[in-house]
Structures are given as structure tokens and as C-alpha cells.
UniProtKB/Swiss-Prot annotation:
Top-level taxon in the UniProt lineage: Eukaryota
Keywords: Membrane, Mitochondrion, Mitochondrion outer membrane, Phosphoprotein
Name of the featured protein: Mitochondrial fission regulator 1-like
Post-translational modification Phosphothreonine, affected residues: T27
GO cellular component: mitochondrial outer membrane; mitochondrion
Protein family per UniProt: Belongs to the MTFR1 family.
Record-linked InterPro entries: Mtfr1
Record function comment: Mitochondrial protein required for adaptation of miochondrial dynamics to metabolic changes. Regulates mitochondrial morphology at steady state and mediates AMPK-dependent stress-induced mitochondrial fragmentation via the control of OPA1 levels.
Membrane topology type: Peripheral membrane protein
Residues spanning the membrane: none
Cellular localisation: Mitochondrion outer membrane
GO biological process: aerobic respiration; mitochondrial fission
Post-translational modification: Phosphorylated by AMPK. Upon stress, phosphorylation by AMPK is sufficient to induce mitochondrial fragmentation.
Length: 289
């Protein structure tokens, strides 16, 4: 009998007292022995210097086990590795995994990657949302500035403020100039630009009766004239301060209302769009008439 022929276990002793139930079943049933497992071994394993180790391939010589990821404990018998962390694979292990053997670790990593939340995607979405909100606020500021410059007309002052400024026509231009600025341009420096207070002769030219009475008093005594002129100037300055206070209160009220509207960019944009469409409708109606 040849050496390569495999002999089933039930054919060793065809008869005798040592025959068991397994041998009896094997002789009666058409069973075949399982084929031997064949592994892919490293090439030229017989040429390696194995010292006293017999050149018989074992599981340590199988290529796909030695080259597997994170399996530093698996090594070829020809390698000399005293420690695991200092191990480097030999050039003979650069081989592909056997296609018949499934790579379970790779499938597990893919499943874990699918189960984990997409943190980079979430961070990107949050960054995009922040950038969009910043851009929306900038657009709202620009639109509000344009709308303020377009809507600040002479009608900005109400009837009360126009009545207050009516006895002083020389200051109407200054009040009208302050309304043409944007909200951010209205500062305390605008008060410096108010023209100088008119002198007493201007007041006399405005009211001739007052000039006659003052002329009589000046003829009486120069000291009384100085006192009266000082009292007139102080009363006029007090009147100007009161007018400035009225105008400042009016501006603060209008600014507070506009600032409340400026808090929400969406409200500003919708208001500007509403005005724009209203102007378009007015133009269309005028053209139609």
C-alpha cells in the first residue's frame, strides 16, 4: 500500500473483538474520510536557516496568519523577536490574504464605522449654520442702512418738532441736516455743528418794538443795558437748551424704535421688501393713470 493513501479508521481491523460501533457503521455506510487541510506556506522555507527546528510547516509558518493586522504574536519560526513592540515583519510576509479565509476584522470595522455618529459632518453643519447666520446679520445691517438713508426724509420730524422749530427758521437747516445721517452717525459731536447764537442786534431787527424799548433803556443807563442784554442772552440760551432737549428726546424715541426693529434680521429684510413692493405698486399705479 502506498504512503499517500489514507486508510479509514474502520478499515484498520476488519474483524475481531476490537471492532466498535463506529467501525460497524462505517463499513455499512458509504462514508468518505474528510480531505486534509491545505495551507499556503511561505516560499523557500527549506532554504531558511532553521537551526535545530525540523523543516515541517506549522501554523506559525502560514503566511496569512503571520501577516494579519494587529497580530504581532503570530510570527514565522525563522524570525527572532524578543519583544512584541520591537517586532517588524520580515519581507517574506508581504503576501495577500487567502481569498477562502474571510476577513472578519474588516467587516467589524465597517460596521463600527457605520454605527458611529458622523462627528465631522455635524461639525461642518454647525460651522455652516454659524456662517449663514453671520452673513444674514451682515445683510440685514446693510439693508437697514440703505433703508434708513432712503426713509429719513423731511417727514422724519413730526408735527410737534416742526412747531417747536417754527419760531426759529435759522435752525431748521441744522435739524434737517441731522436727519440725513445714518443712525450710527448721530453722536454728541453733531451738537458742536449748531451755528452760533445770534447777537442782540439780530433780535432787534426781528422785532422793532423790542428795539425801541431797549433803546429807551440804554439811554437811561449803561449798567441796566448790560444787565438786560445778559438776561436776554441767558433766556435765549435757556430756550435753545430746551429746544435741543426736545429734539434729543424725539431722536432717542425714534432711535429706540428703530433699534428694536433692528434686533431681528429677518424682520428688517421683510420690512424693506414690503416697502420696495409698495413703491413698485405705486409706480405701476401712477403709470397706469
Amino acid at each position: 500500500m502506498e504512503a499517500n493513501v489514507t486508510i479509514p479508521i474502520w478499515q484498520n481491523k476488519p474483524h475481531g473483538a476490537a471492532r466498535s460501533v463506529v467501525r460497524r457503521i462505517g463499513t455499512n455506510l458509504p462514508l468518505k474520510p474528510c480531505p486534509r487541510a491545505s495551507f499556503e506556506t511561505l516560499p523557500n522555507i527549506s532554504d531558511l536557516c532553521l537551526k535545530d527546528v525540523p523543516p515541517v510547516p506549522t501554523l506559525a509558518d502560514i503566511a496569512w496568519i503571520a501577516a494579519d493586522e494587529e497580530e504581532t504574536y503570530a510570527r514565522v519560526r525563522s524570525d527572532t523577536r524578543p519583544l512584541r513592540h520591537t517586532w517588524k515583519p520580515s519581507p517574506l510576509i508581504v503576501m495577500q490574504r487567502n481569498a477562502s479565509v474571510p476577513n472578519l476584522r474588516g467587516s467589524e470595522e465597517r460596521l463600527l464605522a457605520l454605527k458611529k455618529p458622523a462627528l465631522p459632518a455635524l461639525s461642518r453643519t454647525t460651522e455652516l449654520q454659524d456662517e449663514l447666520s453671520h452673513l444674514r446679520s451682515q445683510i440685514a445691517k446693510i439693508v437697514a442702512a440703505d433703508a434708513a438713508s432712503a426713509s429719513l426724509t423731511p417727514d422724519f420730524l413730526s408735527s410737534g418738532s416742526s412747531n417747536v422749530s417754527s419760531p426759529l427758521p435759522c435752525f431748521g437747516s441744522s435739524f434737517h441736516s441731522t436727519t440725513s445721517f445714518v443712525i450710527s452717525d448721530i453722536t454728541e459731536e453733531t451738537e458742536v455743528e449748531v451755528p452760533e447764537l445770534p447777537t442782540i442786534p439780530l433780535l432787534c431787527s426781528a422785532s422793532p418794538e423790542c428795539c425801541k424799548s431797549e433803546h429807551k433803556t440804554t439811554c437811561s443807563s449803561s449798567e441796566e443795558d448790560d444787565c438786560i442784554s445778559l438776561s436776554k442772552a441767558s433766556s435765549f440760551a435757556d430756550m435753545m437748551g430746551i429746544l435741543k432737549d426736545f429734539h434729543r428726546i424725539k431722536q432717542s424715541q425714534d432711535l429706540s424704535r428703530s433699534l428694536l426693529k433692528e434686533e431681528d434680521p429677518a424682520v428688517l429684510i421683510s420690512e424693506v421688501l414690503r416697502r420696495k413692493f409698495a413703491l413698485k405698486e405705486e409706480d405701476i399705479s401712477r403709470k397706469g393713470n
